[in-house]
Amino acid sequence: MLQFAIPCLLGLESLVGDEVKKLGLADVRVENGRVLCRGEERDLARLNINLRCGARVLLVLASFRATDFETLFQGTRAVRWEDWIPREGEFPVTGYSINSTLHSVPACQSIVKKAVVERLGAAYGLQTLPETGKRYQIRFSIMKDEVMLCLDASGEGLYKRGYRAVGVAAPLKETLAAALVKLSHYNGRDPFCDPFCGSGTIAIEAALIARNRAPGLNRSFAAQHWAMVDKKIWLDAADEAMDNEFHDKTYEIWGGDIDPHAVEIARHNAELAEVDDTVRFEVDDATRFHWGGQYGRVVTNPPYGERLLEQKEAEELYRAFGRAVDKLPETWRVYVLSSHTEFERCFGRIADKKRKLYNGMLKCDLFMYGKRL
């Protein structure tokens, strides 16, 4: 079996772990910032095409302990890189080190690169490797002196679904947007609303989840070009994903924004995601938000003081939005992502639950309101 590592934003590990288990992979282990699992070659494709909240899919080739450069070099050189990287393959190296003796990332990059060059040169009988072929990105991590050597099977991050042709300022990554939808326990039955929709990411991810449409169907992945991987696994994984999609259901998914240009972009993105028949976008003022019906949920990412608005303007916006939300039935659930430390005071309500998340490098809280949480 092959071993995989799926890095993710801090706070999303359990969601990614649940996704991996649902796909049927073995030995799933959740760690800080990543999920480890085991599977077959076909799971390279299945993970890449189906994961909503993971950052990327890494193929783990080796794990060992190293506290000096010689051990790092020998451990790297012992890996059968030639089983994966052909003689013309390009293999850049990147990585990170946390709480480890080998703390200099550039030095570790150099050592890993040198060891792989030596191994492949010996395997192919070459003094100089051309590196003119397809890319085989090597990624290493060193955490508490434990080294993990991987090949990046995704290429571009999994947040790049292929539907964001253009964006508005300060977009929310698709992986985090999908996580917000999942944390709201949206099941496709109740109305789903994002009153600060921007380029539509949260509502589009809700539509993909409601329809059980795999997020990676409209893009390509690095491992599709690997010579050592059977091309058929990608067709089979795509067929499996499309067979699992729901086609005969209707949903009430709505996004609103006060900026007409943002709404235009959101509609275009929904078309690219092939969910324009599932989600509706309108020009609307979030401070006047209202909705009929006894049940529903609001999941939204309003402007932070750190980005689009000055802090006082953001606070006034939170107050006005809070007054609008107060008019909803108590049976509604409301989820608001914000980095503002005084959000609850401004919003006018103490959250029933909070969850710490990161929007990129920005530390945030997901404020959750509702009796049915």
Where do the PLM segments sit?
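Non-catalytic nucleic-acid substrate-recognition regions in nucleic-acid-modifying enzymes
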Residues: 1-134
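Short beta-strand/turn micro-motifs composed of small residues
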Residues: 8, 257, 338
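A short, flexible beta-alpha/helix-coil linker loop
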Residues: 98-101, 157, 303-307
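C-terminal edge-of-domain segments
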Residues: 138-154, 367
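SAM-dependent Rossmann-like transferase core, predominantly class I methyltransferases
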Residues: 149-185
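Conserved S-adenosyl-L-methionine
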Residues: 172-291, 306-307, 311-315
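C-terminal catalytic and target-recognition region of SAM-dependent MTase-like enzymes
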Residues: 285-288, 292-373
